[in-house]
Each structure stands twice: as structure tokens, then as C-alpha cells.
Amino acid sequence: MEYFDMRKMSVNLWRNAAGETREICTFPPAKRDFYWRASIASIAANGEFSLFPGMERIVTLLEGGEMLLESADRFNHTLKPFQPFAFAADQVVKAKLTAGQMSMDFNIMTRLDVCKAKVRIAERTFTTFGSRGGVVFVINGAWQLGDKLLTTDQGACWFDGRHTLRLLQPQGKLLFSEINWLAGHSPDQVQ
């Protein structure tokens, strides 16, 4: 289990100066050719998402104005807060800030031939499904994960097992993503 605080994470500026990324974790760790990666991006201007051939991207708006996602004749989608949206990361997708203000989103990318991610929003205590990887990010409230207290803008990343996240207040919201490996693939093969 690895814990993180978004306010203390290193920031990578985009080459096009339209935003920045905070990488949460990758699997395998510290590998350029990852099977899955979780990150948080701040988008300050209209622009295109980076291309990642053979990957699926699930993006979830965390804060800021809605964002219009356009991909030629494939889709036009308005990204609304806390509603995950998946698309192939090897297609050109343009992001337009509809309110003209900076947006922050959670991204998870998976290799299509190896694993699949699901992204959900939780507002009550729950136990993960025992996947072979996952990430949680606290949007608000106080949550207990094992012996660790997680609050707004904090989270955790794991590579195996079931985990219970206990809401400690009457209200709270967190984003969580779990990774499931496709038949014939296992994280044990790449570590």
C-alpha cells in the first residue's frame, strides 16, 4: 500500500503549457511501458490529450467547469463532475473548457490487451472487490483505510488484496478505481 497527498506530489508541466500532471502510481512501478497508470491532471487551457497507443483512458472531472471532449466523428461528450468517461487513448481527443476556468481530473489508463479499470464514486463505507490493483482519492470527508486516516486530496494505491474504506463522518465522497487483469495475464508475471 502506498499513500499520497496531492498537495505534496511533484508536478510535471505539459509541453504545450496547457496543464500539468501529478502521477499517483504506475504498474509495474517506475516503468515507462506501464500496464496501468493513475494520475491527476490540472487543465488550464483547451488542447489535446496525449496519445497512448493500445491504452484505454478513463477520465473523471474532480473540480472546475465542465469539459467538452471531442474526437472527430467518434464522440462529443460533456464531462461532468464525478462521472467517469472511458475512451481509447490512441485517438485524438480535444478538451475544451466550457466555463473558461481551470479543471482538475483523475485519469487512469490501462493496456487494453492486459487489464481493465473500473472507476466509481463512493459515499459510504465499502470493501474493494479483491482486485489486483487500485487507487482511492478522497474528494471530501474523512475515511479510514487500515490504520491510516485519509482526508481531502489524500489517497492510496495498492497492487493486491481487499481493502475496507470506512467513512468516519455523516457525509463524504471518494473516487476509487480497481484494476482487473484479463485472462492469461497476471501482475505476478511482470514484477
From Swiss-Prot:
Matches recorded under CDD domains: cupin_HutD_N
Signal peptide feature range: none
Expression induction or repression: Induced by various environmental stresses, including low temperature, osmotic shock and oxygen. Expression is induced more than 10 fold by reducing temperature from 37 to 25 degrees Celsius.
Annotated protein name in UniProt: Protein Ves
SUPFAM superfamilies assigned: RmlC-like cupins
Provenance organism: Escherichia coli (strain K12)
A Pfam family assignment: HutD
Family: Belongs to the Ves family.
One GO term of the biological process aspect: cellular response to cold
